[in-house]
């Protein structure tokens, strides 16, 4: 498997989530990946209140980050603050999605809908 360089981010995944793809089945993990574009202020506030401090920022490709980790929303069966591998880099579960699918993760982005 080849490494892909995406705006300075090295990943082992052959397909990466993009705004135009919208949804991918990650071939290296059991997750289906989608993206969402919502205000992160409450998510960041709650994370900091839990004692996990890092810089919130948006990567040049529009992926929302907490420190060096991709912000992810996941099913409640995946503990909050867990680390998960995504096609866009290592993610941290800071948010929840409402889908019943426990194998779906939503990646926080600044990709306008």
Features from the language model and the residues they span:
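Solvent-exposed, well-ordered loop and adjacent helix/strand elements within mature globular domains
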Residues: 20-113
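Gram-positive cell-envelope targeting signals
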Residues: 1-23
């Amino acid at each position: 498997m080849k490494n892909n360089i995406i705006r300075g981010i090295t990943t082992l995944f052959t397909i990466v989530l993009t705004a135009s793809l919208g949804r991918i089945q990650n071939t290296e993990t059991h997750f289906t990946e989608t993206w969402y574009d919502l205000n992160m202020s409450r998510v960041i506030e709650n994370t900091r209140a839990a004692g996990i401090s890092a810089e919130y920022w948006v990567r040049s490709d529009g992926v929302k980050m907490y420190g060096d980790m991709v912000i992810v929303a996941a099913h409640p069966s995946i503990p909050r603050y867990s680390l998960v591998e995504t096609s866009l880099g290592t993610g941290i579960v800071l948010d929840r999605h409402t889908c019943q699918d426990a194998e779906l993760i939503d990646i926080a982005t600044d990709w306008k809908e």
